[in-house]
Amino acid sequence: ITSSLEQYEPCEVLFYAAEVLAKLMGSKDVAIYTVANRSYARLFSATSEKARSLGNSINYSEMDAMYTVLAGKKVYINKNMDERYPLMANAIYSEDEMQLILMIWGIPWERMTLGQANMLTVIGYLIQNAVVRANRYISALEQQRYIKGTNILEPEAFLALVKAYLNARDKGLTQCALLSVDTKENDRDEVGKRLIKLLRQSDYVGELEGGKMYALLANTSAKDATMVRERFEKEGVSCQIQEDVFV
């Protein structure tokens, strides 16, 4: 498992961990949420519409039945088939901090057993190192690779993220959109600041070759991207939806 994940760039690992998990658990419906703080987690990758059903952001601390079990570092099994929860879930920890929540649907009742729970625990341990390392890499990327004095990612770092997201989108592991932003030489920093205020924590602003500015919107469908673009335009940020990057 770990070797199959190690073939990917660090910023791709979390996407393909969902694919590996789905294969090993024999389910088409798997989601991975990254824990943002002690209450909220954000959807990072999902293998189906069903796996996206809880939404892009969840208050996991209020999902009592599941949270209590995960906080005790055990696998949650949804024995009551409560539709508000996945059928099984497991949390990945690093130094006693919850980092990720793995969620599974699409498995028959007879497979929701202690044996499967143990298997999910083992898979969690196996992908933990690759995934925690990838998570740290992305955090470091965000901290260290900004263009000096701005919150705009420099081209090499931004291109790696964009390619990872677009490849994962093409494989159905995530939804995302890329907006090219119109800037002039003298207002780039101002537009960048305005843009960052309009974006969510999970989105990115960066430059590609030639100094062109882009916004990468995570967990955003084509329909949502159109609405985001319209909202940006109203705030004075002119942009277009870009289908791909040609670099």
What does each model-found stretch correspond to?
Residues I1-E12, R145-I152:
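Short regulatory/linker helices and ligand/cofactor-binding micro-motifs at input modules
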Residues E6-Q7, Y16-K73:
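Structured interaction and signal-relay segments at domain junctions
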Residues I77-N78, Y85-Y93:
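A short, aliphatic-rich beta-strand micro-motif
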Residues I92-M103:
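Short hydrophobic/glycine-rich mini-motifs in sensory/regulatory modules
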Residues I101-R111, L217-N219:
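Short beta-strand-to-loop transition segments that serve as allosteric relay/switch motifs
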Residues R111-V132, I138:
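Amphipathic alpha-helical "output/dimerization" segments
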Residues F158-T183, V191:
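Active-site-proximal structural segments of metal-dependent nucleotidyl cyclase/transferase enzymes
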Residues E185, G192-D224:
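Conserved helix-loop-beta segment at the catalytic/binding core of cyclic-nucleotide signaling proteins
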